[in-house]
Amino acid sequence: MNRSVKEKDAFRVMVVGDSISHGREGDWTWRYRIWQWFEQEGVWVDFVGPYAGTSSPDKPHPPRPPWLIDESPEPPPPLRTDGGYAKDVAPRFLANSNHFAAGGRQACQAKDVIAEQVASHQPDLCLVQLGFNDLGWRVSGPVETLASMKHLVDRARSAKPDLKFAMADIPYRTDLPDREDLPVSTKIYNDLLARSVPYWSTAESPVALVRFCENYSCGGSNSDAAYDGLHPNALGEYQIARAFSHTLVSDFKLGRSALAIPDRIPPRPLPTPASIRAVSAPSGITITWDAVYGAFGYDLQHRFARESDWESTHVDSNRYDQRWLQKGQAVECRVRASGGDTLKSPWTKVASAVADPQTAPAPTNMVTRATPTGFAISWEPPPPPYAGEIDRYGIAHFDSDQPGAVLCTVGVRGQSAEITGLTPGHRYYIAMETWTTAGGGIPAAARAVVVGRGTPPAAPTSVRAQAVTRLAVELTWAGMPAAAGYDIWVRDRRGVLRSLALCPSRERVVRVSDGSLSGGSMMKAVIPNMRPSVWEWEYAVEAYNGDNQSKLSEWVTPPPEAPESPEDMSLADTDSIHIALNHG
């Protein structure tokens, strides 16, 4: 078809959406399925927009050091829009696949850029699929998201007053831990949108609702239409296109009948990755393999040689760097391509390598102090030998009181730093690693902090000891709001002190569970291997916030009566401490 003739005479359509509409490399996409429907219905359309492809996969790269905190903010990664489609899409579609959809896009972002795109591409009709990211990422609630969609319509009209809109509601996602709010917010938003859309139309610029949600087989425990609980698989692509086609037929008189979903949905090709290799590298062991076209990443399993159990991880590119290894450790690994939660290729053969890392150990003498909005930390450089010069240190912190929190790491130079912008009252776990030209070394933990509570907490109270077996004792005490953690101390009858450690670092502290900020929480620690018996020792508890420590609690001993529990209780033969919370 002659492009100039097509541009002049065709009905111009722009898809405005997020990753659901953008698609990933190897997808057919619902945009292709509705293009096929237009072709079958004899509707001559020209898809317009700034992009033409899907989202291309991540490129493999070695481990990158964390961004330096005193530099300009790390720029966002460039938008990837050059990914290919399924190998069997019609060549004519590849010349007519333009769109304005991008992974991660929110309605509150799209409303600020839509006028420019409409002015540039002059669509006659916008197929709008947005809003999930606003709710799913807690950017805004249902009312605010609805307002963003109305602003999008208004600003698009400012560039083309006669623009038509087919506006989709949002799908239910499969259930997520700690996100009971999401299906509730989804229903509220969809109800608001359905009631509002009729009032958004004008005589020359109609707006019609697309019932994406009710046509999409996803939500709760059902994921028939989605490969990951949200994004469409081959069936889901047909279902979304069908939902839009219903609206185009009924409200815009485009086409004669809605798209019919075929009985046989084409399978996604997913061969086993080829050429897996594992080699020793300065940072540990590097595993690579040939990329699989259309894979949504890879499942990788690894284990130390002669062990039977695999550890699993998911990677987005065809490379994985096994870090934090000791010299001489042999690692085995295997890989399979992933097409989502249920579609997997067969595993590769097992590859192996022996580590000879050249990285530096973690810094020493780390000292932390809570501040009103974060924490301050100081340290000393690690002792040699190690390869190369120290380039920077990585400071990692994790908010244990925020559901869904992720580990954040920033780069620093020197021997001290202050991290700000954290949530007062929340507990943060902290660790550091050293970066040289060889890469990042094995991290070590510093003392955790409760932000905004910098003074040393009071001594723990209500400390009690109870024999569990002849060699194991259970300690309980009242949890403290200002404590980030606790030291457990014991002394023998001669008064010789001993600190019990959970972590193999300078931190002697038992890391407490979430929820212990409540002053009414009771802490519990089980201490095994108190030889020759638990009655030969006295026990005390010390609270801390960073390196600010309380006084020791009173010393306690278990009652002298013999325990009823059997002496062969299943406790590890190490100085580990097991903490639990009893509420009430």
Per-region residue spans from a language model:
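Conserved SGNH/GDSL esterase-like catalytic core that processes O-acyl groups on lipids
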Residues: 14, 20-147
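Active-site segments of SGNH/GDSL-like serine hydrolases
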Residues: 127-136, 153-188, 211
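Catalytic His-Asp segment of secreted/periplasmic serine-dependent ester chemistry enzymes
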Residues: 172-271
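Pro/Thr/Ser/Gly-rich low-complexity, intrinsically disordered linker/stalk tracts
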Residues: 251-294, 327, 342-387, 424, ...
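Hydrophobic core positions of the immunoglobulin-like beta-sandwich fold
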Residues: 289, 320-323, 417-420, 465, ...
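Solvent-exposed loop/turn segments flanking beta-strands in beta-repeat/beta-sandwich domains
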Residues: 290-304, 382-401, 479-500, 536
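Short beta-strand segments within Ig-like beta-sandwich modules, predominantly Fibronectin type-III
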Residues: 310-317, 407-413, 501-503, 513-521
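Beta-strand-rich modules
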Residues: 322-343, 419-441, 527-550
